[in-house]
Regions:
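Trp/Phe/Arg-rich N-terminal binding region typifying the photolyase-homology
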Residues: 1-153
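Glycine/tryptophan-enriched, flexible segments
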Residues: 117-119, 138-241
Length: 244
């Protein structure tokens, strides 16, 4: 029996609540990312995005050492069914994805699949985003409490990660290698931290005078958007380093 951690737009180990909770369980933990054909063909995305994802996964794998994420090009339900032929899935852990309609409908289908197969799916809020709020009267209070709460640490040495070598025989595991492009920001937590540190230490000094200048603002702004969007960094982790 195993548990699964399903990476979505939360490609990090640090300050990752569902991963933190999954790490407390006794079962082996399979780390997985699905590169879905429906999303590949969706006009919201391009190869730039998927290369960023690959680089983010590679960055995590480097931190994990001998273990790695099972990186697949398939539909999540299809993947879970195939994994179930080899292992009994007890629970799936993930963040609630705040994406597009396609991912929302996919998650509804995954929930139905889990319910019909007695799989517990534990979803956690990402960056204190609340689904279905009727008003935001108490939201700011909760947000302040969230960002001031302790950043969750992961002890990688104690992560009971399932070795994917057996699953590699029944899946075509994707390669994370990408061509380097000096004009694009590379994905991964380690790269996000480099941009954050350079902003806090140097580039922020010209932020106010350059923010409205198209050329100068490229270097004086934080450049953290992709790292927050794809979850290489959590908003709480960033704010903890800024000490606001």
């Amino acid at each position: 029996m195993i548990n699964i951690y399903w990476f979505k737009r939360d490609l990090r180990l640090e300050d990752n609540e569902p991963l933190h909770e999954a790490s407390k369980q006794s079962e082996k933990l399979l780390l997985i990312y699905f590169l879905e054909d429906k999303l590949i063909s969706d006009p919201h995305y391009s190869n730039f995005h998927w290369n960023f994802v690959k680089q983010s996964i590679e960055d995590i794998n480097l931190s994990l050492g001998k273990k790695s994420i099972l990186f697949l090009n398939c539909d999540p339900i299809e993947g879970f069914k195939k994994i179930s032929e080899k292992y009994k899935i007890k629970s799936i852990y993930s963040h609630m994805e705040t994406g597009i309609e396609l991912t929302y409908l996919r998650d509804i289908d995954v929930k139905k699949y889990c319910d019909s197969n007695s799989i517990h799916w534990f979803e956690y809020e990402k960056n204190y985003v609340k689904r279905g709020l009727k008003n935001r009267k108490s939201w700011i209070k909760g947000w302040n409490e969230y960002v001031k709460s302790p950043v969750l640490k992961i002890d990688i040495k104690n992560l009971n990660i399932l070795d994917i070598k057996h699953l590699s025989k029944i899946f075509n595991v994707l390669d994370t290698r990408t061509n380097k492009n000096k004009h694009l920001q590379p994905g991964g937590t380690s790269n996000g931290l480099k941009y954050l540190r350079s902003f806090l230490e140097v580039r922020n000094k010209s932020y106010n005078q350059n923010i409205s200048k198209p050329l100068e603002s490229r270097s004086s702004c934080s450049r953290l958007s992709p790292y927050l969007s794809w979850g290489n960094l959590s908003s709480r982790y960033v704010l903890s380093l800024i000490h606001i």
